[in-house]
């Protein structure tokens, strides 16, 4: 018989249901944040212009982490003639789930003649987390976009391993409704793929960068491949995908340390930005802090 003062189940804290909608429009040569709407703990800082007319915006999530039951829904729309750069100030931490899934769904829409850089910092998956991370890019012919995602399995800074939990990754890139690239995966903490040579090969950091636009050619892929590492603890490769309406480059990175993977991805973005967007790369100030 249970004593009424000692409940049989652990109390589960309430979950956050947060959303953010941003729309970028052209005002002459300048890109402005024309509309914003948020619910819950997702918001955006005042736009900055370190590159002249290009609009830089930083998305904030004050709780700093995503717990079981939380949902984050982010939608960005870049109208024709705009160029927006979106970043986050720190890593997204996926906490122990207490049995509930946590999710983040990002929807990016890029119109004809628009340019977008989607450059969030990494996701850190804590032990016993159940994380669903989805990114959808819908891009029109004549638009261009470069973006990335990186995941760290376990808390490297504290030596914590990822021994329990599940990670779902869903990335889709479409042009005029037609799929350029769709990848959906589920990784269990105990999966043999984590140690398999054809899987993660014992690595705990994985990154993906995509670059979409008419400049994403096979020649550019071959040029980029020459500067990508391939060693025991850090390896990367690039693939060119094309359709009649659009083409894209896909860069994959596997490593043991986030800092090394980040360096590869920033270097790839720096090499791709001018061929894809027609704009030279300038490192974000956030990366120096």
UniProtKB/Swiss-Prot annotation:
The keyword Nucleus does not apply. Its main location: cytoplasm. GO terms for cellular component: cytoplasm. GO terms for molecular function: nickel cation binding. It is found in: Cytoplasm. Coiled coil: none annotated. Keywords: Chaperone, Cytoplasm, Nickel insertion. The keyword Cytoplasm applies. InterPro entries: UreD (IPR002669). Belongs to the UreD family. UreD, UreF and UreG form a complex that acts as a GTP-hydrolysis-dependent molecular chaperone, activating the urease apoprotein by helping to assemble the nickel containing metallocenter of UreC. The UreE protein probably delivers the nickel. Required for maturation of urease via the functional incorporation of the urease nickel metallocenter. This is Urease accessory protein UreD. It comes from Cupriavidus pinatubonensis (strain JMP 134 / LMG 1197) (Cupriavidus necator (strain JMP 134)). The gene is ureD.
């Amino acid at each position: 018989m249970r004593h009424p003062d000692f409940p049989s189940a652990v109390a589960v804290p309430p979950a956050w249901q947060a959303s953010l909608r941003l729309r970028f429009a052209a005002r002459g040569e300048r890109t402005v944040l024309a509309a914003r709407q948020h619910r819950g703990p997702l918001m955006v800082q005042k736009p900055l212009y370190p590159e002249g007319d290009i609009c830089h915006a930083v998305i904030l999530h004050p709780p700093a982490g995503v717990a079981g039951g939380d949902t984050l829904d982010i939608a960005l729309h870049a109208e024709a003639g705009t160029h927006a750069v979106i970043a986050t100030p720190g890593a997204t931490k996926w906490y122990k789930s207490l049995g509930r899934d946590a999710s983040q769904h990002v929807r990016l829409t890029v119109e004809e003649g628009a340019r977008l850089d989607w450059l969030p910092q990494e996701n850190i998956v804590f032990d016993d987390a159940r994380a669903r991370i989805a990114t959808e890019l819908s891009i029109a012919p004549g638009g261009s976009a470069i973006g990335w995602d990186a995941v760290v399995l376990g808390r490297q800074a504290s030596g914590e391993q990822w021994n329990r939990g599940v990670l779902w990754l869903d990335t889709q890139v479409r042009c005029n409704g037609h799929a350029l690239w769709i990848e959906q995966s589920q990784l269990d903490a105990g999966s043999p793929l984590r140690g398999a040579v054809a899987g993660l090969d014992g690595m705990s950091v994985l990154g993906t960068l995509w670059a979409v636009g008419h400049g994403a050619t096979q020649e550019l892929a071959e040029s980029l491949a020459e500067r990508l590492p391939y060693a025991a603890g850090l390896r990367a490769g690039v693939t060119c995908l094309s359709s009649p309406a659009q083409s894209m480059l896909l860069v994959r990175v596997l490593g043991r340390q986030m800092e090394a993977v980040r360096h590869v991805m920033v270097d790839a973005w720096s090499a791709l930005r001018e061929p894809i967007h027609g704009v030279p790369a300038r490192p974000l100030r956030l990366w120096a802090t």
